[in-house]
Amino acid sequence: MKLLYSNILPLGTNENQQTITDCFEEQLSKADRVEIAVGYVSRASLDELNSLVDKYNIRNICLNIGMYYIEGMPEASYHTALKLNKKWIADGIGEVRMIRSFKYHGKIFCFYKNGEPFSAILGSANLGVLKMEASNRRQYELSALTTDISECIEISDHILKLKMPNCSANIGDISDMPLIFEKNTALSGIELVTEVPPSNVEFY
């Protein structure tokens, strides 16, 4: 097991330590398939994952998202995940699944080559660790990398169980996804800009 860190002062990484983000990309560069199960995602991290999948020519990927079906999903993240799901299906490489049976709060990333898992990252980091934003820039995460084959197989088996129909479904097949509508504050406080009341929005 190798510990992986966030690089946030005053607890910055030293020359012998590796960040979670750098390790993820390093393992992805060696893989042809990746299986991911996390609690939360962000729009920026979904875009970053898509870029990395293209960069390293990943042939098979499944992203399982665990908390939103019960808690509700931010609208922007939902539409980004839906778009990514459509792209991966069209490219024939994978899908985005939502865990529906319970709130899943695990965070695991399993990497494969030629059909066999060779490494896995597990710990506190959700997908958002791939792309720092204002909301998580000061959020310290700690994870670990394992290359123990028996542990990797156990983690792989766990993710495959999450993908079963009794636990999850493809995001595109879910018609009752609860969404959280986010307020756009980009024009708040700007002179001559008036906010339209919700009742007027519904009318139009």
Q: Residues of each region from the PLM?
A:
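PLD/PLD-like phosphodiesterase catalytic module centered on the HKD motif
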Residues: 1-204
